């Protein structure tokens, strides 16, 4: 099973909206918002798993793949490195966050702006 992980609830909902717009089955996977990533730790060696992520994985042993949709900024990149450090031996982990925009919500809002411009 797959767990899609987001930095915020708005990014999670934006992702589900994008999936629905593309007519993909967004209900088949699991979703989790970390509600921010700054509490993960100062260094990789001191890192602790976010509580929500640890609990979710503990009660869902069928999860094998973690798709990270964290923000395209320093905090997001640091969090990706820390999650890889803590869980990389137990899970397949993929960085699927936006590469040219700040976050998933920006991807969605730009998509709607483009549609609006085309309809004029």
What is the predicted role of each segment?
Residues 1-4, 65-66:
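Short active-site oxyanion
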Residues 3-6, 44:
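A short glycine-/small-residue-rich loop at the edge of a beta-strand within enzyme catalytic domains
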Residues 7-8, 72:
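Helix N-cap/beta->alpha junction signal
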Residues 11:
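Conserved Rossmann-like nucleotide-cofactor binding loop
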Residues 19-120:
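TOPRIM fold recognition
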């Amino acid at each position: 099973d797959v767990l899609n992980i987001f930095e915020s609830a708005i990014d999670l909902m934006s992702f589900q909206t994008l999936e629905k717009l593309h007519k993909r089955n967004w209900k088949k996977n699991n979703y989790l918002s970390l509600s921010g990533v700054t509490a993960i730790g100062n260094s990789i060696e001191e890192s602790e798993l976010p509580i929500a992520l640890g609990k979710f994985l503990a009660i869902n042993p069928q999860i094998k793949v973690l798709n990270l949709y964290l923000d395209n900024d320093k905090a997001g990149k640091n969090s990706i490195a820390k999650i890889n450090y803590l869980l990389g031996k137990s899970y397949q982990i993929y960085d699927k966050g936006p590469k040219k925009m700040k976050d998933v919500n920006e991807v969605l809002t730009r998509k709607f702006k483009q549609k609006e411009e085309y309809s004029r």
